[in-house]
Amino acid sequence: MKSFKKVAIIIFTLTFGLSIFSCKENKSTMLNQNKPLIFYNRQPSDPVTGKLDFSAVSWNSRTYYLGTDSQNGGETQGQMILDFLQNSNGEEIDRNGDGIIGYVLLIGDEGHTDSKARTEGVRKALDTWNNSTKPNIKKEGTVNVGGKTYKTVELAAKSMTGADGSTWNAAAARESMKIWTNSFGKSIDLVISNNDEMALACIASENFPKGLPVFGFDANASVEKAITSGLMTGTVTQNTDSQALALLFLVRNMCDGFLDSAVYTQGFSHGDKYGNKISTPFVYYNDSRSLLVSNTAINKDNWNEYMQNAHNSQISKVQSSRVKLLLSVYNSNNDFLNQNFIPSINYYAPLLNIDVTIIYGDGQNESSCLSKFTNLDYYDAYAINLVKTNNAHLYTNKLNEK
């Protein structure tokens, strides 16, 4: 997101007009191509270069991308690791006493915006960044551990792709960690993963060294025991509950007829007419039509603060007309979406009077979602979680059909 112009969400906004195409007023006549469309979690982009697919996010005036600030996420994970090292005893971290902090890096998906940002953030923090997120392009660096300078070496990095072609694959992570443990032994001082699921797979791998610091990303419910017991050192929350609420607010606002900046400020920077307001700050990037939430580092000391009673109890029931939303989930086995995001969607949707129909994919083939992306006239809005980030046009093409 570096090149995109940032537009801060401010308390007061000048535009509060109603659209003549509000969902409420035109359910029977509105063309699907004019309805609200939100891409979320997986930004439409080139999977190789990461370049934004602007034609997708600007498909109509009611199209947006909702997600986390990827760059901030990578920086947050990197800083979390630095903070841990600076407050640790170097002799305890450097397991073989060679003066080198060696680490292995589990990459989720080389072409995914979030994965690339996390890889970059970690390498920059550990001074191994060599202007690339590719697995084998890095350099040696230095880092402060407990007041002493140590050399840093990325012993191995690998994109975790399963035999079936699925990315962010836990089975691949488990097998890779087993191989690395056998190959590098006590040279491994840290395990760093682009997500929690792969981090947990490493901990469960054969002969995994007890007490080895492990860092993940997502703060899934499945890592609670690992975090609170110290098996896992740290993770990063994408403030998922707020993301889910934000998606529903975007839908609600557009279907209630709000235009322009009112779409992403009503309920965000200020409360709606019921006093409902998201507690987490969001930033809107005008050049990419993206609404992004910041990230927070999590360890055993602050897990309860961020994860217990995660739902916003201040959100009250609205009296607006009922809205029907079709929402896709790219992978029915994805922990982040199924443990965190979807439960929040299911919690808030009734409060905002939104009926949500969820379709699930297999994480590999776009057709697994696209084949269920049907009966489109029935719905007032759509939320798409792409299987492949360069396939947004397949959905907009269907919405364009007469």
Q: What are the roles of these predicted feature ranges?
A:
Residues 27-33, 37, 122, 144-225, ...:
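Hydrophobic alpha-helical
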Residues 1-8:
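Bacterial N-terminal signal peptides that target proteins for export
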Residues 28-29, 107-116, 190-196, 323-344, ...:
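Extracytoplasmic "Venus flytrap"
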Residues 26, 30-72, 91-102, 220-228, ...:
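Flexible loop/hinge segments that line or gate small-molecule binding clefts
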Residues 58, 64-98, 117, 170-174, ...:
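Hydrophobic alpha-helical segments within soluble ligand-binding/sensing domains
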Residues 97-102, 106-110, 114, 126, ...:
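Hinge/cleft segment of the Venus flytrap/periplasmic-binding protein
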